[in-house]
Each structure stands twice: as structure tokens, then as C-alpha cells.
Amino acid sequence: MTDRESSRDKGRQAEELACAHLRRQGLATLGKNWTCRRGELDLVMLDGDTVVFVEVRSRRHRAWGGALESIDARKRQRLILSAELFLQQEARWAKRPCRFDVVTVDTSDGQSPPRLDWIQNAFDA
């Protein structure tokens, strides 16, 4: 297994942990790893009447910065554009309120299970 495959697998594991956590909080899954020409939406969830676009960030080493800090303006713009395309293609959700959340998965101290933080309304569109 290459480092890239290993990182991808760890990213998918973090997304599964985040999805399970959000489902326990009452959210329903609308989509996972939704891709388009603009990028990818890790999770698309429904929280009551609100469509929630979730970016999952995982960090093993705090020296590289926190997971939330890794979402720069360019990444936010790609997420917003991807969400717009999702709503165009999935018109049944287009008239609902939307928000962008982030779930951070922290494995930096070797905790088992990893620490998850759910940041609602992490940024505005």
C-alpha cells in the first residue's frame, strides 16, 4: 500500500466515523463523497429541514496545524461551488436552508477512539 492509498484509507475512515457520529446526533445521510468538476463533498446530511454540507478533516500531527485551520479560503470556495452544483442536480433539496459544518477527527495523541469535534456553521457561503 502506498502512502497515498494509506492517507486515502485514513480519510475514508475519518469520514465513516464522522458520519456515524452525526447520525447518532439525529442527522440523516443524503450522500457521501459526492464528486463534481469543482471538487468533492465528504458528506451531505439532513438536519431537520436543513441540508448540511460536511467537510471532514483528520489530523495525526498537531505540528502541521489543526484540522479546522487546514480549510483555507480556496477550499471553502470549492466547497461552496460543489454545494451549489449538488443543489442544482438534486433539486428536491434546493429550496431548503443550508449550512456548512466541519467535523474534525483528531488522532494526534493516539487516543482510541479518536476525538471528534462537530463545528456547526463553520463558515458562511
From Swiss-Prot:
> What is the recorded name of this protein?
UPF0102 protein PA4424
Question: Which Gene3D superfamilies did the record assign?
Answer: 3.40.1350.10
Q: Please give the Gene Ontology molecular function terms for this protein.
A: nucleic acid binding
Under the heading InterPro entries, the entry gives: Restrct_endonuc-II-like, tRNA_endonuc-like_dom_sf, UPF0102_YraN-like
Instruction: Cite the SUPFAM superfamilies for this sequence.
Output: Restriction endonuclease-like
Protein family per UniProt: Belongs to the UPF0102 family.
